[in-house]
């Protein structure tokens, strides 16, 4: 049987469920931004590696404007 990667959305869901359990009843705040920030950085790292650091290629792969990509790379400390 071939090895299959878990669905990304399922991985996120499982981690969020664990996050809420770990809060132990404490009311969360800013979950949306937290999740986007946590997902965006590894996405950027992986795509930049796949593109050999070429921001123009990475922006096309991501469907982002090159300046938007550059801004995000700076925000995540990747430049």
UniProtKB/Swiss-Prot annotation:
The keyword Metal-binding does not apply. GO terms for molecular function: sequence-specific DNA binding. Keywords: DNA-binding. Residues 55-74 bind DNA. GO terms for biological process: regulation of DNA-templated transcription. Belongs to the transcriptional regulatory Fis family. PANTHER family: DNA-BINDING PROTEIN FIS. This is Putative Fis-like DNA-binding protein. It comes from Neisseria meningitidis serogroup B (strain ATCC BAA-335 / MC58).
């Amino acid at each position: 049987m071939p090895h299959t990667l878990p669905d990304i959305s399922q991985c996120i869901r499982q981690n969020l469920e664990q996050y809420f359990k770990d809060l132990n009843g404490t009311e969360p705040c800013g979950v949306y931004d937290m999740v986007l920030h946590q997902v965006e950085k590894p996405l950027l790292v992986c795509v930049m590696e796949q593109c050999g650091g070429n921001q123009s290629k990475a922006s096309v792969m991501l469907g982002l404007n090159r300046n938007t990509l550059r801004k995000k790379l700076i925000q995540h400390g990747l430049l």
